[in-house]
């Protein structure tokens, strides 16, 4: 079987409940179970959101499922005067060159981890026998548009470009939704012809729930329906739409509601955090309000699978969210906005019952309807067998990209012209960089 590397800045364990981490953990365990030799390279070094387990603990846990969990951080031997994401991508290139043993490498476009590695392959210098699959999830530009966020500085614009180029230089692109491919094409990205829509694999269920977190259960169902906002507590996830819809609840509606829960990560919203924003907006609601932010994915799913729960997912923009996916595969009652790739997850005949336009009025109307018709469980549009088969086919598919080999006999003189004025330190850095080039026929002027 082929040797596969899944390279990701987000993986279950070190990261608590990210969508990319959920997707790549699910893919890694699916491939390992099939018999592939799977390594996972976590690219954020020592960063961890896990208080109960170290990275070594998680590496040991993953090994029990046939996966070798590795990590890499910024290279310290080279002084790189560049933004973090560029230093990180170059450090990853060096790691991949030292560990050039993989038949297939899978990564996402977010953070542009693969930029320099793909550039090296396109230049004909490395990775002739490695196929790179970019599994698109959410570029920074796409996320910023959803959050109505302008770029912070020129570095942000550079990241936009690098993430775009990661997609364009890929040997193959796999997206969990046609929507995201259409979005990239609409931005005039040169998406490779070898592109496919394959849903994410079902979330891995083998991890134990955290012992330091007690998930509330209701063996005796509450007298009313609990509304659960499920997702990161931010604008893009529809937080404000949900809060405004709650204000429209009538006294009759409230009689059938046991409480409102916000289940997701706390984030900064301007000068305050989402906790403060939620409490300010719900202080006169007249219903019990609960905010839960310390659950990982496993704990969160145990919570929403309880009885008399109606999950609300009012996102403004989404690719193929696991919040919806997990409701579908776990038979959880839910409502979701009809944006992005969400409708692609749900059988067409159930769209009218579970989808809404992301406005407070339309969301309230659907909540009002579902309070009286709660049990609607459409199931995922595709079987796990078909999803897994599509992924196995992607791994086995031959790389048809043309590798441009360097002509060793053709070594023209390269003139490097450096402009400088009273910046001796930076000039020394530039000259030192030129001296370390592997190409020797160089002159400096």
Task: Annotate each predicted stretch with a short phrase.
Residues 22, 225, 234-248, 425-428:
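A conserved mid-protein helix/loop that constitutes part of the nucleotide-sugar donor-binding site
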Residues 157-194, 204:
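A short, active-site helix/loop in glycosyltransferases that binds the activated sugar's phosphate group
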Residues 257-276:
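Glycosyltransferase donor-sugar binding loop
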Residues 274-303:
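Nucleotide-activated donor-binding/catalytic signature segment of Leloir-type glycosyltransferases, i.e.
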Residues 316:
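Aromatic "clamp/platform" in nucleotide-sugar-dependent glycosyltransferases that forms part
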Residues 397-433:
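N-proximal low-complexity "stem/linker" segments adjacent to membrane-targeting elements
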Residues 432-441:
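Short, acidic, metal-binding catalytic loop of nucleotide-sugar glycosyltransferases
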């Amino acid at each position: 079987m082929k040797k596969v590397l899944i390279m990701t800045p987000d993986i279950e364990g070190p990261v608590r409940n990210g969508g990319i981490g959920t997707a790549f953990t699910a893919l890694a365990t699916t491939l390992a179970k099939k018999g592939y030799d799977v390594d996972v390279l976590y690219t954020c070094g020592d960063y961890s959101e896990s208080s109960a387990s170290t990275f070594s603990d998680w590496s040991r846990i993953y090994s029990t499922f046939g996966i070798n969990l590795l990590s890499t951080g910024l290279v310290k031997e080279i002084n790189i005067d560049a933004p973090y994401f560029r230093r990180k991508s170059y450090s990853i290139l060096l790691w991949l060159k030292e560990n050039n043993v993989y038949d297939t490498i899978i990564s996402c476009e977010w953070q542009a981890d693969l930029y320099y590695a793909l550039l090296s392959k396109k230049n004909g210098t490395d990775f002739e026998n490695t196929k790179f699959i970019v599994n698109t999830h959410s570029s920074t530009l796409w996320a910023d548009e959803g959050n109505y966020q302008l770029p912070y500085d020129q570095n942000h614009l550079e990241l936009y470009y690098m993430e775009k180029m990661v997609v364009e230089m890929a040997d193959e692109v796999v997206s969990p939704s046609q929507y995201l491919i259409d979005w990239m094409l609409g931005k005039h990205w040169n998406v490779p012809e070898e592109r496919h829509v394959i849903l994410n694999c079902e979330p891995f269920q083998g991890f134990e729930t955290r012992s330091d977190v007690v998930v509330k259960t209701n063996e005796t169902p509450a007298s009313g329906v609990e509304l659960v906002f499920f997702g990161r507590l931010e604008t893009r996830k529809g937080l404000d739409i949900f809060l405004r819809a709650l204000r429209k609840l009538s006294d009759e509606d409230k009689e059938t509601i046991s409480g409102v829960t916000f289940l997701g990560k706390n984030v900064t919203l301007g000068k305050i955090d989402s906790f403060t924003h939620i409490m300010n907006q719900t202080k006169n609601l007249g219903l019990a309000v609960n905010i839960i932010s310390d659950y990982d994915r496993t704990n969160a799913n145990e919570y929403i699978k309880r009885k008399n729960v109606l999950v609300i997912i009012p996102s403004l923009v989404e690719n193929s969210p696991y919040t919806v996916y997990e409701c579908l595969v776990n038979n959880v009652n839910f409502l979701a906005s009809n944006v992005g790739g969400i409708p692609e997850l749900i059988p067409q005949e159930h769209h009218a019952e579970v989808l809404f336009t992301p406005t407070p009025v339309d969301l309230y109307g659907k909540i009002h309807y579902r309070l009286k018709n709660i049990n609607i469980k459409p199931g995922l549009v595709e079987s796990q067998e078909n999803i897994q088969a599509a992924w196995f086919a992607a791994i086995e598919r031959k790389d048809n990209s043309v590798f441009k080999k360097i002509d060793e006999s053709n070594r023209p003189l390269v003139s490097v012209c450096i402009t400088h004025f009273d910046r001796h330190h930076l000039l020394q850095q530039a000259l030192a960089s030129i001296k370390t080039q592997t190409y020797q026929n160089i002159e400096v002027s």
